[in-house]
């Protein structure tokens, strides 16, 4: 369902990193991370970072 990059972003969100920190770590722009998060939220039906983290934890994606 989620792409490998989206899974990587969710893992970093769960680790408590900000969008800017994630962008720096992955060599992307913060806007690209925003786009990844919007895509993730839409695919899994959530509206927040904490809900995305909970979703990933419940499905053992982390």
Task: Indicate residue ranges for each PLM-predicted region.
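Helix-turn-helix DNA-binding segment
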Residues: 1-38, 42-44, 58-59
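Short, basic, alpha-helical segments at the C-terminal edge of helix-turn-helix-like DNA-binding modules
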Residues: 47-60
